[in-house]
Amino acid sequence: MTKKLSPLEKKNRKPASKACVFCHSKHLQCSNERPCKNCMKRNLGDQCHDAIRKRAKYLNTSGVKKMKSRTNSISSSYRSPSVSESPQNPYTHSIIKQEPDLNMRGELQSIQQENTSHNQPGPSNVSHYVDQRPTIPTNTMLDTTNDVLNKLLYSEPIHSDSISLRDSISEQPEMDSNRRSIDTMFNSNYLNQEYLMLGDIILHSKPSSPSPSNTSASEYNGDATISPANTLLNNTRLDFDNSNDHMSNSKRKLNKLKDSRPFIALGVSNDVPISLQPEGTLSLDNLSTKNEIMNKDNISSNSLKTDYVSPLISHHIYQSVQDIYMHSIPNFDYPQSYHSLTNFLKRRFSGNSLAHDQRQAKRNNLLIILKLIASYRPTFISAHKNLLKPYDLLFLEMSFQRSLIDYEKLLLFNSSPSIIWRRTGEIVSISNDLLSILGFNLSEILSKRTFIMELMYDDESIINYFKLFKSVAVGNLHSSIITKCKLMKNSSAAFHNEASDVADREYIEFCSAWTVKRDPFDIPMLIIGQFLPILPGGEGVRKY
């Protein structure tokens, strides 16, 4: 244990200008003489010498700049064919120009190897040096941020189909100077991410209709995309059938990819057909192999049936678990289902025949519902953006049909009236008890696209439905909900056995309990609702 010093000793002692190795490692107060007192006490006098300090970074800038200029002169005088094409390839150029700090260690090691070698560096040696540089993955987020900034601040997007090779080479230095001035604008990845989203909205996003559901029409379609920029990515499939057009096609497609960027997704999307290597060098063998794989996926996705199949037909096809694996499962088009839901809500809340105040109240209710849908739909889209299409989509639909068969068997042993619907609200199963209570038959509900909201009588029940579904759609894993709602009766059906006041009304009030079944991605797949009617009190009538 270190001896406790008196106040006089503390006052008289002077700190050493440099500590020895032992005192520096043990964080002890060292003295100026060598060997110091601490080393003498521990019989380490022969090992006592000054600790070597690291040189400050600001003192190394001049030496690093000289080494950088030397390496740049060597690489410019002797350049391999893959690097000489960098003005045409934006990804190679971004590595050489934008990331000197990341590649500095590799440059210093290369300079040391060059100084120790006896041979004079020739063109073959330097090309080997350039090719053997350590590959460090580039920050593609920063690269695309610079592209967005260049578009917003300096010039319009450059389309490679409308310019020649000479024009693209002449315009590259100007783009590089603009890019260098913007490199250090944002040091935060989150800030760059925000700016990328804003840039995509400004440059690319043009919704086809004011409906919020149209902004995300690609939840499950392999060919649909979230933004028009993804359409450009899907259109840039490389064709390697003719060997003479390999390099020209790759250059043209890469230039087209430079001015495009999809919205942010969870992981790397499998829709992108080519691999952009950090050095910008394209391996034709790898690209042709990947192109064949993607062509097979495109064929399978195009052959995937997306036509609407009513739940009534599905019940006749998939009557057992064996039928699910024996028959081909058509892909359920969730975006189209959301569009149909939006059209129904617009018709339901139009209020054309009502007074101005009532029509305005209807529109306000519609706005509330659309905001609730827009709050959870982007999460569904982003969670399914990285699915392997069409195989994951088939797996999810098979899981849905498999769960539906199990729950329908369970409802046969349950005496309460029940409805099963998808997360879009589309009804896929309804019990005979509830059909008899409401006065509908099975074909009226399941032979077409019918939403659970269509059976609700008042606007308050519909708004309450979307509020409750929003509470369990994202984040909250509580899988049961208890609420009240009013379901309308069939106006053409006759009710003779009910109480007089119930028969006169156009609706029946129910106490409802929901059970939410989630898919493997923790997104609601189907909802099982049990509805118990609330009947008026009286003799011989049970009230729930």
Curated annotation (Swiss-Prot):
Residues 65-93 are annotated as: Disordered. Residues 70-86 have a biased composition (Low complexity). Keywords: DNA-binding, Metal-binding, Nucleus, Transcription, Transcription regulation, Zinc. One of its GO terms (cellular component) is nucleus. The keyword DNA-binding applies. It holds the Pfam family PAS_13. One of its GO terms (biological process) is cellular response to starvation. Residues 403-475 form the PAS domain. Residues 20-48 bind DNA. It comes from the Eukaryota. InterPro entries: ERT1_acuK_gluconeogen_tf (IPR050335), PAS_13 (IPR056751), Zn2-C6_fun-type_DNA-bd_sf (IPR036864), Zn2Cys6_DnaBD (IPR001138). It is found in: Nucleus. GO terms for molecular function: DNA-binding transcription factor activity, RNA polymerase II-specific; RNA polymerase II transcription regulatory region sequence-specific DNA binding; zinc ion binding. The keyword Secreted does not apply. Belongs to the ERT1/acuK family. Transcription factor which regulates nonfermentable carbon utilization. This is Glucose starvation modulator protein 1. It comes from Debaryomyces hansenii (strain ATCC 36239 / CBS 767 / BCRC 21394 / JCM 1990 / NBRC 0083 / IGC 2968). The lineage of its organism: Eukaryota, Fungi, Dikarya, Ascomycota, Saccharomycotina.
